[in-house]
Regions:
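General beta-strand structural signal in soluble alpha/beta enzymes
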Residues: 6-8, 26, 51-53, 78-83, ...
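A contiguous loop/helix-start segment that scaffolds small-molecule binding in enzyme catalytic cores
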Residues: 48-49, 126-216
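Short, polar loop motifs at secondary-structure junctions
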Residues: 7-13, 198-201
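A short acidic, often aromatic-flanked loop/helix-cap motif at beta-alpha or helix-coil junctions
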Residues: 30-35, 86, 110-112, 169-172
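Short, small-residue-biased leader/transition segments that mark boundaries at the very start
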Residues: 1-5
Length: 216
């Protein structure tokens, strides 16, 4: 267990009651580099520091930037503890939509140009991947899910099954099964995970299922 815990306020609030007596350091959004530098400063003091990352630290998480910022301190030991990313936890809620080949695409253009995101959506839907969308919407990107659906609808049927899981693992968790066409006008936020099936995905007893190819 760590002596010091580093992360945004929202994630610290989720764990602080489980680690009483520990020191917690928090930063705001878009302060990832500063957060890593603070963690290194504490580690250089001889403390064991735990960087808290939602889901899996190696999937849209803090593991990569932590290694980059700590590159000049090879004497520090970094251990990445695997977690459960939203694609896996969300898929479990929806059924079994990611049984076949799938890809993860973030709709956030904060670090990736939208033009590159558009190309990835187009190529992935052309290749008939099941697609899991991270960061589908925010206050400034309220129409990005609509844009993404319009791109995918060029390559997929409008009735391809899709699902939304909101607030995964929290008390207010909820989900809904829909279609790619209907998904376009659904309300989502940064705590939503969206999964679009491929051409073989079906709804079985209210759950999304993508066949692997077994003969029944």
């Amino acid at each position: 267990l760590g002596d010091v815990y580093k992360r945004q306020h929202v994630y610290i609030d989720l764990i602080k009651n489980d680690f009483t007596g520990k020191e917690f350091l928090t930063t705001g959004m878009r302060k990832e580099v500063d957060r890593c530098k603070l963690a290194i400063e504490e580690a250089l003091k001889g403390k064991t520091v735990a960087m808290i990352s939602s889901g899996d630290a190696g999937v849209y998480g803090m593991a990569g930037i932590m290694y980059q910022v700590a590159a000049e301190h090879p004497e520090l030991e970094i251990e990445v503890v695997p977690g459960i990313t939203a694609a896996c936890s969300g898929a479990a809620v929806l059924g079994a939509p990611l049984i076949s080949d799938f890809c993860l695409i973030s709709l956030s253009d904060l670090l990736t140009p939208w033009e590159k995101i558009e190309k990835r959506l187009d190529c992935a839907s052309q290749a008939d991947f099941c697609i899991c969308l991270y960061n589908p919407s925010s206050f400034k990107r309220h129409d990005y899910l609509q844009k993404a659906c319009d791109i995918m609808l060029k390559n997929q049927r409008p009735d391809v099954p899709a699902g939304i899981v909101r607030n995964i693992g929290r008390d207010c968790e909820n989900y809904e099964i829909t279609t790619l066409q209907e998904l376009r006008d659904k309300e989502v936020d940064m705590f939503s995970t969206v999964i679009i099936g491929n051409s073989q995905t079906e709804v079985i007893n209210g759950k999304l299922v993508t066949p692997r190819g077994y003969k029944l």
